[in-house]
């Protein structure tokens, strides 16, 4: 049996007496429900208008004269600055934390700050043969996300389409049963919307992106009675206002042409005229002076065939690159000599279908090429390669294969591909 000495009993009694004389104050804290609707007037979630709301809270005790930690609230401006620096492929996780974050990430405020702070990153939007939904990849092709199905008719779904990006908008145009249609996917809301239509709806045109705007030129206009016309008209889309503006027309009508934005100007290269003749000339548009300058014979060394795709061109830094499909090789343009320098073979089979089914784009400071691998004994699945020209001053490019591709196998024939910087 355990017995206590008198000295131990005394200590216990003293302790008990002390506890009776001192009242222990126990505070209860309310744990906030982060999914409770804020008591603010949110002005139109679907319109993408940013609403200032504090999603962070401070734990406060019921006893008003006491504060345990005095945790400061995270102010709205700081929230935006932090979220703007988070990789975009992590945003879906943040949207699950609470409704405040979800609403903020669905606004355009985050992407506006990303542009202002220079923390934008490229994403690749792609549609391969056999797919009914577009896929978005991060720049390393380690993460991907399926977009919602585009709610168009069956003619649009299975027909030829053009794709371009402006700001956070992915724009896809094509022919529906009765007319040429334009659909846009908004990155903030992850939803498809129809329109706004171009001033002159068209297909098979040239396009180039500059930040939040995109230029389109030339192409094929289809009348209501089915007649087709090659056009020389030019338009600019502003993703901030969701409007099209008519610009000065080109010197020549052209379809199956390609565009790029280089050194502050919109370039349109190649294509076919209204008589179906291949064009070796190009044109550059200076928006400041609203003028077009003809560039004779810029594609004079290019080979043409009856099944030739539009020129495969991409801009990295201040250099213009071309994938010459007939030779399956990469070239860089020398503006002073108006000629192209050969840089070596590309690791995909661009020659097989005259350039169709191959994506050739700029991805930040890298060149990106997607298609069927040119290597022997390769399965007919999509291969992705990148090369950084600045890392090879001797103009000897080295291609690095992205072998992950999210662990998903895609068809090697690429129907549409464009890069969004946001």
From Swiss-Prot:
Entry GO CC: nucleus
Pfam families for the chain: Kelch_1
Domain F-box per the UniProt entry, residue ranges: 68-114
Keywords: Kelch repeat, Repeat
Transmembrane portions of the chain: none
Keyword Repeat set for record: yes
Residues in Kelch repeats: 162-212, 213-264, 266-312, 314-361, 366-412
Name by which UniProt lists this protein: F-box/kelch-repeat protein At3g27150
The species this protein was found in: Arabidopsis thaliana
């Amino acid at each position: 049996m355990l017995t206590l000495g008198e000295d131990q009993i005394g200590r216990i009694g003293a302790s008990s007496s002390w506890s009776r004389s001192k009242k222990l104050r126990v505070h209860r804290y309310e744990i906030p429900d982060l999914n409770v609707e804020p008591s603010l007037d949110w002005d139109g979630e679907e319109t993408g208008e940013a609403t200032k709301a504090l999603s962070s809270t401070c734990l406060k005790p019921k006893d008003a004269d006491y504060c345990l930690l005095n945790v400061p609230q995270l102010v709205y401006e700081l929230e935006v600055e932090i979220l703007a620096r988070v990789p975009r492929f992590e945003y879906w996780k943040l949207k699950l934390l609470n409704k405040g974050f979800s609403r903020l990430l669905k606004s355009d405020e985050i992407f506006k700050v990303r542009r202002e702070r220079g923390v934008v990153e490229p994403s690749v939007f792609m549609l391969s043969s056999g797919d009914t939904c577009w896929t978005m990849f991060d720049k390393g092709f380690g993460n991907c996300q399926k977009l919602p199905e585009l709610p168009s008719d069956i003619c649009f779904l299975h027909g030829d389409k053009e794709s371009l990006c402006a700001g956070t908008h992915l724009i896809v145009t094509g022919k529906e049963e009765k007319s040429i249609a334009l659909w846009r996917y908004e990155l903030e809301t992850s939803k498809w919307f129809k329109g706004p239509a171009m001033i002159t709806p068209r297909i098979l045109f040239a396009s180039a992106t500059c930040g939040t705007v995109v230029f389109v030129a030339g192409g094929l206009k289809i009348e209501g009675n089915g007649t087709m016309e090659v056009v020389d008209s030019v338009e600019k889309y502003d993703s901030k206002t969701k409007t099209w503006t008519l610009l000065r027309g080109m010197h020549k009508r052209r379809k199956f042409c390609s565009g790029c934005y280089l050194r502050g100007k919109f370039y349109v290269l190649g294509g076919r005229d209204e008589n179906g003749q291949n064009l070796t000339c190009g044109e550059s548009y200076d928006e400041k002076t609203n003028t077009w300058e003809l560039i004779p014979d810029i594609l004079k060394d290019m080979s043409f065939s009856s099944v030739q795709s539009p020129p495969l061109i991409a801009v990295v830094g201040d250099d213009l690159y071309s994938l010459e499909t007939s030779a399956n090789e990469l070239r860089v343009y020398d503006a002073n000599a108006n000629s192209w320098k050969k840089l070596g073979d590309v690791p995909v089979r661009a020659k097989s279908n005259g350039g169709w089914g191959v994506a050739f784009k700029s991805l930040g400071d890298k060149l990106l090429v997607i298609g069927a691998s040119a290597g022997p004994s390769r399965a007919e699945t999509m291969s992705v390669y990148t090369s950084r020209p600045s890392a090879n001053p001797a103009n000897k490019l080295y291609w690095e294969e992205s072998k992950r591709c999210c662990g998903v196998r895609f068809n090697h024939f690429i129907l549409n591909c464009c890069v969004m910087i946001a």
